[in-house]
Amino acid sequence: MSITSPPIEVSVLTDSIKNLLEKNFLRVVVKGELSNVSLQTSGHLYFAIKDSKAVLNGAFFHFRSKYFDRKPKDGDYVILHGKLTVYAPRGQYQIVAYALTFSGEGNLLQQFEERKQRLAAEGYFDPKRKKPLPSGARVIGVITSPTGAVIQDILRVLSRRCHQFQVILYPVTVQGATAAQEISQAIQFFNQNSMRVHALIIARGGGSIEDLWAFNEEELVKSIVASSIPIISAVGHETDFTLCDFASDVRAPTPSAAAEIVCKSSDQYRQELQNLRRYVSSHARQFIAAKKNLLTHWQRHLASVDFYHTAQQTLDYTRAALERGIETKLEYYKQRFAQYRRWLKSDVLIRIEKHLADLNQSLMLSIKNKIYTKKTSLNQLYTSCLKNELLNLQHRTQHSRNILSQLSRRLHIAIASSQQTHQECLVRLQNELSFTIQHLLTKAKERCQAIQEQASSLNPKNVLKRGFAQLFDFNKHFVIISAESLKQSDLVRVCLQDGEAVVSVKEVWLNNDKKG
């Protein structure tokens, strides 16, 4: 614009700068220290973000509804995502943020993404290497804290969904510097010992990214990949993701869901996969169409949204200025009130007090005379009313006595008749109750005797008395129920009625065929 150009209004120039700024800085990421933080009752956040050389004012609309769990304060180091705009009433440029990350969390998220990309490039998350879950797993290893609610949720689901199962718990700490190492050692323990575990569940409840960081350690990822036993990761809530989830063979949204997954058969998985495929295909088309319509709608109304934000910011600034004005006025009137109080303590106050005392004495004398006159009149009226009321009360009392006498005679007749009827009913009910109690006692005794006989027949010690024996491995870790688990020269502990014996296996037959 040259010197000879016609002058333009400030608002026109400001709008031109605003359009130019918003077009070239539509998406910016700024980091720095917060100052002058103010969270309004409307839920909008106003602040300044600065470094050692510059300061930038900013606004975050509807902040309270998005970040209700933590309120920023002066001195916080943050990373802001937003766009640059101009607040026209003050002629200053500012950032309007739509996302805020505290610096510590930002560093962890960046470290998470870098580690995830590197391990993925090395093949640790390759779907081809993932192992399928066995159908009908019955022996399940669980790696989690022994005191939390997670293990109780898993046991409750397994008890409801699985008919036969055995859980082997390896207790670990699930948070802190040693958690990743303990979980890795647990995975190695199950793989190196012949526990015959069909699947492993690594479980933990929800938490922040710092709480779940142990499950992002590279040591744990490599232990999961090296495991020959299929592993289900059930860490955090459904919205939480860790590197443990990507490395494991199956990811469950919650520990309870992991227990349900391990109980499912391959047919159930296949059916659920087909249903899910149909559901995703159908809803994806609907979702894309809806989002296209929504995008078109918001593109048309984007200008009105910016106008609303500007108006809201003006309203918040006006409210803040009004509050400051009210505080200033209050302070002014407090000072004026103090001046009036000092003035009233002068001679004027003394004259006013004397005049008030004279008025008070005259008023009290007049009140006493009025009270005496009204009291005399009231006593006369009260005496007359009392005599009339007493006469009426005597008439009502006599009438009530007559009615009471009639009711008393009728009540005696009704009570005598009712007692006879109730006595007969009571005798009948006592007879029926005695018969019912005797019948129930007889049935309960018969049922108790049957249960005792059944329990006696199921008692393993009674079975041993009939010539049977129980076989255990040498260390009595598990019961031997199949000849397939035996091989030649194995040492077996035999439990008899009156003692135990250790025997060595010479030969094993399966269905009349010799095993070895």
From Swiss-Prot:
Q: Is Amino-acid biosynthesis among the key words of this record?
A: no
What does the subunit comment say?
Answer: Heterooligomer composed of large and small subunits.
The protein's UniProt keywords, in alphabetical order, are: Cytoplasm, Exonuclease, Hydrolase, Nuclease
What the entry lists under Pfam families is as follows: Exonuc_VII_L, tRNA_anti_2
Its family remark reads: Belongs to the XseA family.
One GO term in the molecular function aspect is: exodeoxyribonuclease VII activity
What Enzyme Commission number(s) does the record list for this chain? 3.1.11.6
Record's protein name: Exodeoxyribonuclease 7 large subunit
Which reaction(s) does the protein catalyse, per the Swiss-Prot or TrEMBL entry? Answer: Exonucleolytic cleavage in either 5'- to 3'- or 3'- to 5'-direction to yield nucleoside 5'-phosphates
Q: Which CDD domains match?
A: ExoVII_LU_OBF
Q: What is the lineage of its organism?
A: Bacteria, Pseudomonadati, Chlamydiota, Chlamydiia, Chlamydiales
Function, as annotated, reads: Bidirectionally degrades single-stranded DNA into large acid-insoluble oligonucleotides, which are then degraded further into small acid-soluble oligonucleotides.
Top-level EC class = hydrolase
An annotated GO BP? DNA catabolic process
NCBIfam families membership: xseA
Q: Where in the cell is it found?
A: Cytoplasm
For this record, an example GO cellular component is:
exodeoxyribonuclease VII complex
Would you say which domain of life the source belongs to? Bacteria
Does the keyword Nuclease feature in the UniProt annotation? yes
